[in-house]
Amino acid sequence: MSDKPNAVSSHTTPDVPEVAATPELSTGICAGDYRAALRRHPAGVTVVTLDSGTGPVGFTATSFSSVSLEPPLVSFNIAETSSSINALKAAESLVIHLLGEHQQHLAQRFARSADQRFADESLWAVLDTGEPVLHGTPSWMRVKVDQLIPVGDHTLVIGLVTRVHAEEDDESAAAPLLYHEGKYYRPTPLGQ
């Protein structure tokens, strides 16, 4: 699996400063070195979908994380320059899909131009609550948007999980899809 997506959200942390106009960040570190270090950290691949009121919106994100078990909270972040940012900020709920190794095509599709993401209607349906949901995803969670926190050049989204779905069939129970050094991977266990 070596195809590169057109765009994938990157990790940020609350103490990361905004990018300065020069190749150096405001802390004096080289922006290229910072990006290179982050590329070396593998991440699970998710697709976030929501209903904007005028149609479905979705994007690929690698910044997903669990935050709390009680209450069940999750997080991800989105760039302020994303074509999906305004719809996300207006959304009350969304669905986070944890992609399987067999779903690289979805990661790439939702990293493309917004008008192409939902073009193939055979790939998704609509939940009774209105959010688009992708077929064949090993796990997905319906999330109520709890907090939107501006952090540097991104917005950190904290969501309360209100519904969890896990597929039982063999294909959907496949290993998760990972993103590392600009490529997609499947995890393999170390020798035991």
Swiss-Prot record:
Pfam families according to UniProt: Flavin_Reduct
Record localization: Cytoplasm
Location, primary (coarse class): cytoplasm
Stretches for region Disordered: 1-20
Catalysed reactions, as listed in the record: FMNH2 + NAD(+) = FMN + NADH + 2 H(+)
Record-level GO cellular component terms: cytoplasm
GO annotation, biological process: dibenzothiophene catabolic process; pyrimidine nucleobase catabolic process
E.C. code: 1.5.1.42
Enzyme class: oxidoreductase
InterPro entries: Flavin_Rdtase-like_dom, NADH-dep_flavin_reductase, Split_barrel_FMN-bd
SMART domains given in the database record: Flavin_Reduct
Described function: An NADH:FMN oxidoreductase which supplies reduced FMN for the '4S' desulfurization pathway that removes covalently bound sulfur from dibenzothiophene (DBT) without breaking carbon-carbon bonds. Provides DszA and DszC (DBTO2-monooxygenase and DBT-monooxygenase respectively) with reduced flavin (FMN); has no activity on NADPH or FAD. The pathway substrate specificity has been augmented using mutagenesis, however no mutations allowed use of alkylated thiophenes.
Family assignment from sequence similarity: Belongs to the non-flavoprotein flavin reductase family.
Protein name: NADH:FMN oxidoreductase
Organism: Rhodococcus qingshengii
Chain's gene name: dszD
